[in-house]
Amino acid sequence: MEIFVISCDGYLWERAYTSLNDAKKELQSRGFVIDFNSLDTNHYIRTIKYKDITYTNYAKIKSVYL
């Protein structure tokens, strides 16, 4: 069985997804967009700006077989 997990800034999210589309929808609902600087379409990026501080999160969807 194949499941999909999200790794964000080096940490795995606690939840796993049964479809790639569900994992993508979860990231998009949290403000992530596809990172077009990467050749892999499963790389996502989110930039948060607050006052003078800009913070960037990087996420990747990984496939795991059970």
Regions found by a protein language model. Give the residues of each.
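A short, exposed loop/beta-hairpin motif centered on an aromatic-Gly-Thr core
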Residues: 10-21
